A protein has these predicted regions:
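Generic recognition of long tandem-repeat/solenoid scaffolds
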Residues: 119-122
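Donor/substrate-binding cores of folate-linked one-carbon enzymes
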Residues: 1-117
Length: 122
């Protein structure tokens, strides 16, 4: 499990643990993700574009940056008075802290499968 992990994982490790390493990203992927989007930069991007809804995404790690199969997402409303710091806190409290434990539980209980790059929960 990764959270705020800003180090590139070696490709061999990713291949060895395909669909077994998970990450959480503070946006609704595919928006505001990839190279350069981390920490407050994500929320600054959201606010500068006037986005109305953001959130968080738990996904499997692959060779790309925030490109792996999406496990769970949760939306959070963006408020007119938000600062990047306030939005970051709300995304953590209302989304990240909820969906990461849920994703771990689903995986630990064998309820997550990946077929053709898409996650199925059952």
């Amino acid at each position: 499990m990764l959270a705020g992990f800003l180090v590139v994982i070696p490709e061999q490790m990713i291949k060895e643990y395909t669909n077994r390493i998970i990450n959480i990203h503070p946006s609704l992927i595919p928006s505001f993700c990839g190279t350069g989007y981390y920490g407050l930069k994500v929320h600054e991007g959201v606010l500068s574009r006037g986005v109305k809804v953001t959130g968080a995404t738990v996904h499997f790690v692959d060779e790309g940056t925030d490109t792996g199969p999406i496990i769970l997402q949760k939306a959070v409303a963006v408020e007119e008075t938000d600062t990047p710091e306030a939005l970051q806190r709300r995304v953590m409290e209302q989304a990240e802290w909820i969906i990461m434990p849920k994703a771990i539980d689903l995986i630990a209980n064998g309820k997550v499968t990946v077929t053709d790059g898409k996650v199925h929960i059952g």
